[in-house]
């Protein structure tokens, strides 16, 4: 299968996501439900962030959770990292997590977004 020259990352309305974050969270024993609730409570906050194009709170295993979020550019990613959810995560990390969150900056090669 051949791909076009860069058009793979084009989404409807010319809105593109180019960069993302993948955050892995390991809950302390007995804190799994609290981590889940934390992720659920983060959704309304990120919905108010104009540069957060996509945001997912996910469960990877019984005590392993994650966040995947995507942005049109580095400025959007930095705004999110300086925002309320990131601040709340760092404030709760010692209480809820077995180790500090693993935050990976990633590049989005291709995406399909609703629209």
Tell me the role of every PLM-derived stretch.
Residues 2-17, 26, 53-63, 89-115:
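Glycine-rich beta-strand-turn "strand-cap" elements at beta-sheet edges
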Residues 19-21:
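Hydrophobic core residues within well-ordered beta-strands of beta-rich domains
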Residues 24-26, 68-70:
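Short hydrophobic/aromatic beta-strand micro-patches
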Residues 26-35:
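Short, surface-exposed ligand-recognition loops at beta-strand->loop->(often short) alpha-helix junctions
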Residues 31, 63, 76:
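Short phosphate-engaging motifs
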Residues 34-37, 79:
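Short, solvent-exposed alpha-helical surface patches in well-structured domains
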Residues 41-54, 70-104:
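An amphipathic, aromatic/His-enriched active-site/gating alpha helix that lines ligand/cofactor pockets
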């Amino acid at each position: 299968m051949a791909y076009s020259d860069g058009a793979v990352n084009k989404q409807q309305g010319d809105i593109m996501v180019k960069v993302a974050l993948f955050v892995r969270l390991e809950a302390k024993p007995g804190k799994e439900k609290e981590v889940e609730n934390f992720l659920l409570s983060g959704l309304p906050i990120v919905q108010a962030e104009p540069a957060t194009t996509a945001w997912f709170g996910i469960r990877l295993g019984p005590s392993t959770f994650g966040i995947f979020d995507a942005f049109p550019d580095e400025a959007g990613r930095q705004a999110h990292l300086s925002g309320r959810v990131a601040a709340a995560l760092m404030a709760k990390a010692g209480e809820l997590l077995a180790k500090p969150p693993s935050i990976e900056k990633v590049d989005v090669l291709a995406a399909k977004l609703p629209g």
